[in-house]
Amino acid sequence: ARDAYIAKPHNCVYECYNPKGSYCNDLCTENGAESGYCQILGKYGNACWCIQLPDNVPIRIPGKCH
């Protein structure tokens, strides 16, 4: 497991807008992570960051989102 931006197919992040909201935590835990939160103005803009996301779940890697 690792801490990372969870990715949709095609290497795109899940955008989020409310750092206090539960959207990212729900998304991350549904995918097996310990927790997650909305990182505002991070490397990929406002995106969901997951803590201890299982290795089989795709994460945002360098390169284009397409």
From Swiss-Prot:
InterPro entries to which the protein is assigned, alphabetical: LCN-type_CS_alpha_beta_dom, Scorpion_toxin-like, Scorpion_toxin-like_sf, Scorpion_toxinL, Scorpion_toxinL/defensin
Identify the keywords attached in UniProt to this record, alphabetized.
Disulfide bond, Ion channel impairing toxin, Neurotoxin, Secreted, Toxin, Voltage-gated sodium channel impairing toxin
* PROSITE patterns registered for this protein in UniProt: LCN_CSAB
The reply to whether Membrane figures as a keyword in the UniProt entry is no
Note whether Disulfide bond occurs among the keywords: yes
Any one Gene Ontology MF annotation carried by this entry is:
sodium channel inhibitor activity
Disulfide pairings: C12-C65, C16-C38, C24-C48, C28-C50
Q: Which SUPFAM superfamilies match?
A: Scorpion toxin-like
Free-text comment about domains: Has the structural arrangement of an alpha-helix connected to antiparallel beta-sheets by disulfide bonds (CS-alpha/beta).
Q: What is this protein called?
A: Alpha-like toxin BeM9
